[in-house]
Amino acid sequence: MEAARPSGSWNGALCRLLLLTLAILIFASDACKNVTLHVPSKLDAEKLVGRVNLKECFTAANLIHSSDPDFQILEDGSVYTTNTILLSSEKRSFTILLSNTENQEKKKIFVFLEHQTKVLKKRHTKEKVLRRAKRRWAPIPCSMLENSLGPFPLFLQQVQSDTAQNYTIYYSIRGPGVDQEPRNLFYVERDTGNLYCTRPVDREQYESFEIIAFATTPDGYTPELPLPLIIKIEDENDNYPIFTEETYTFTIFENCRVGTTVGQVCATDKDEPDTMHTRLKYSIIGQVPPSPTLFSMHPTTGVITTTSSQLDRELIDKYQLKIKVQDMDGQYFGLQTTSTCIINIDDVNDHLPTFTRTSYVTSVEENTVDVEILRVTVEDKDLVNTANWRANYTILKGNENGNFKIVTDAKTNEGVLCVVKPLNYEEKQQMILQIGVVNEAPFSREASPRSAMSTATVTVNVEDQDEGPECNPPIQTVRMKENAEVGTTSNGYKAYDPETRSSSGIRYKKLTDPTGWVTIDENTGSIKVFRSLDREAETIKNGIYNITVLASDQGGRTCTGTLGIILQDVNDNSPFIPKKTVIICKPTMSSAEIVAVDPDEPIHGPPFDFSLESSTSEVQRMWRLKAINDTAARLSYQNDPPFGSYVVPITVRDRLGMSSVTSLDVTLCDCITENDCTHRVDPRIGGGGVQLGKWAILAILLGIALLFCILFTLVCGASGTSKQPKVIPDDLAQQNLIVSNTEAPGDDKVYSANGFTTQTVGASAQGVCGTVGSGIKNGGQETIEMVKGGHQTSESCRGAGHHHTLDSCRGGHTEVDNCRYTYSEWHSFTQPRLGEKVYLCNQDENHKHAQDYVLTYNYEGRGSVAGSVGCCSERQEEDGLEFLDNLEPKFRTLAEACMKR
């Protein structure tokens, strides 16, 4: 029993040891290492306390919880306060509970918060020797995710300087996001150097921030250089890719080959380039109509191509595609956008036009022209009103004579068959045409390897028509000898009836006959010579004389034709020398060439025979002729004749002996060329005649004309010195003063004794219209006496210094510009008595005239009949002058002024 007790005690101790070890293992397995965080005495709400490494303790935790409600734990281990906390000198702790809900595993982390009063360290004074130590003050990589959800302020990193071991360091920052826009985005804790962000940031607006961190002591000393700190904003896939257009429109030709490019679409993404966020993939997600699938899209470039060659515009002319672009390289979680793409199918000429009928029948009357006889239609499935649809017709067979043409109606696309050249029923009653049609645009070889032209047959029946005479051929000829006797007849123009092919019943009429040489028989069309025919006449061209003939039938239908009369030549013209003046330069030239012509035909012309007229021996002695060819000979002098002009008669005969004599004026001249000939007289010939050149004659004529001009000018100037006033007609003194200063010849008249002094001014001169006038001067007044037809009259013209009543009284010269003279028997009767009236006035004291002096009166206006007024008054006298006693009021004052008071 006693031995057993120690054994039992040992067993109990062993069990207690095992239980203690198990408890320690269990506790060790549930708890992780403790974490101590140094914090200030006061913690504001939602302030970052620190960060705990949760992964180190429990990597599979999916539930995080804090034992103290004043603290909140995030997934990354960040510890934030939920309320404002004041710490005492004692420690404060809480537990972070980590658990996995799947396997019910749990872990704990004990967190201790300690408040440690920071002792300000004094900066070393100069008396203390400083030892040089290596410092670390370099940029620390820093980044933050754009559009972060917080919680804010979001801790970014801690900025620390190694000098904090020796000094009390205060941290501060400046730059964009701090004191520059966007302001107050970042801040740093002065004591700890912790850098925080206060709100979310959009990378598309700010890709990064470069701020400057400063480390200073409380007294302002800066132991470190400013630290450039770059904060990069990490991109988040928060932007959708966007197509550059809402709707894309492309056009492609039908029947195109597989792989033909239709077009290219493009999209943009504002996220960070060269990342998965901007790696785009394109695709087609829908097509209208849905079948068949004819298009594909390259996923990277966005190029749309065809997958089939069966695009047919006549079936479907437009396709609509729904396209998509997605970022993240097209993965299912990428952002995507859709757009619309419209593809229009353009037409090509893949359908040939075909006639709706293969044969047509039509008819037309003969002799009709420029008429439409048939319209043909075609079918074409290509696009209307395009070159692929418009038809182009042509006549393939049956139009060898060019009677028809076919054109296209631009509005209906029909073929219009027309007659452009008249048809003849008597020649052909039916014509068969083959017509074909193609398009304006060439046929597409991609649609069909071969193309065939559509053809149709057109039968044209020619209908008979009662025609007029036919002038066929339109130009006919007859032959007649020139100089044929008047009345000679010949066959004329013949027209035919196309129905009977005969000329019976046709009447003929001459329309044109330039010289009236022939007449035409009305019934037969034969011609008769009316005047002698001359083949060499100017109206004849190439020996043919043309007349125009009109042929008509009984129905009045007509045709016209031309009859050419070929005139057969007879030898009726002698050869002659057209150039009748010859210059031979002596001694450089010893001869001259002379040429003869003959208007007749060559059969009656050359060779010509040239000879000197043998009537005078002097010609034979001085000249000789030598034939050069059939139409020319050489004339040369002999025996050294003197310079001068000679007449040399030459006889020219044609081959039939008809001849003529031409007298040549031959000049022997001392010259080198003919143009230099001055016609000098040979010194051996004395007293030769002198001849004037054309320029000398012209100079003499001009000199004579100049002398005549000078003489004419002198004559005109002499006649102009005599003052000849214009003649003003005396209109029978109707309410005007009668001209009373007439000095007519005759001894049996009583002259005025009023003391007028007269002086002859100039001799009489011939007037323009044949009136002779003579001028006298009366004091300061000029008087012109005009004599015509035995009657006499006179008018006065005031001199210089007074108003002129006549336009001709200028500068002392007068001109007669009017040929009208109003003279009558009344003047012949009254003029001799005017002198008596003046004489009686002087005898009467009560009616004595004023002293003789020139009276000046104001001009009453242009055109006044009484242009000048004399100084004499008259009283009543017999012989019809009683009207002077009863003057009208406007003349009384004038009469009183002329009387002596």
Curated annotation (Swiss-Prot):
UniProt signal peptide: 1-27
Keywords noted in UniProt: Calcium, Cardiomyopathy, Cell adhesion, Cell junction, Cell membrane, Cleavage on pair of basic residues, Disease variant, Glycoprotein, Membrane, Metal-binding, Phosphoprotein, Repeat, Signal, Transmembrane, Transmembrane helix
Record's subcellular location: Cell membrane; Cell junction, Desmosome
Record SUPFAM superfamilies: Cadherin-like
Expression sites (tissue/organ): Expressed at intercalated disks in the heart, where it is colocalized with CDH2 (at protein level). Expressed in intestinal mucosal cells (at protein level).
Transmembrane regions listed in the UniProt entry: 695-715
GO-annotated cellular components: adherens junction; cornified envelope; cytoplasmic vesicle; desmosome; endoplasmic reticulum; extracellular exosome; intercalated disc; plasma membrane
Effect of substituting I345T: In ARVD11; uncertain significance; abolishes localization at desmosomes and mis-localizes to the cytoplasm
Anything else known: Expression is decreased in the intestinal mucosa of ulcerative colitis patients, potential adversely effecting wound healing of the intestinal mucosa.
Oligomeric form and interacting partners: Interacts with DSP, PKP2 and JUP. Interacts with DSG3; the interaction may limit the interaction of DSC3 with p38MAPK family members and therefore repress p38MAPK signaling activation.
Name of protein: Desmocollin-2
